[in-house]
Amino acid sequence: MVKLIPRISSRRNGRIRLRKNKHKIPQGVIHIQASLQNTIVTVTDVRGRVVSWASAGSAGFKGTTRRTPFAAQTAATNAIHTAINQGMREADVLIKGPGLGRDAALRAIRRSGIRLELILDVTPMPHNGCRPPKKRRV
């Protein structure tokens, strides 16, 4: 069955825009990827579809300031704000990476008012897999 989307047109420019209903998302998953240079926070619904995302670079931090905990906190606040506006109340948190911003981003999420069900560290650790690259000589 085809779902009809109401059309909005303006007589001045003749363009037709489509209006989609915003979905309410009560539960979600917050992914924090904290690399050594940047922190990326992605908010998804339970099925894995992206609701919002933010990074320290997209929050306006450039260069070496992107790796700071304050930049990670700002990125987490920006990503969570959109999710809260769409009705998110509960979330699981998956943290990946060795970066400086992992704790600061988690603190910002805790202060946002979203109830956290689960906090997991999903940093990939090799069980003696591939040989690492040679040591850097400066």
From Swiss-Prot:
Gene3D superfamilies: Ribosomal protein S11 (3.30.420.80). Keywords: Plastid, Ribonucleoprotein, Ribosomal protein, RNA-binding, rRNA-binding. GO terms for biological process: translation. GO terms for cellular component: plastid; ribonucleoprotein complex; ribosome. The keyword Plastid applies. It is found in: Plastid. GO terms for molecular function: rRNA binding; structural constituent of ribosome. The keyword Repeat does not apply. PANTHER family: 40S RIBOSOMAL PROTEIN S14/30S RIBOSOMAL PROTEIN S11 (PTHR11759). Belongs to the universal ribosomal protein uS11 family. Part of the 30S ribosomal subunit. This is Small ribosomal subunit protein uS11c. The gene is rps11.
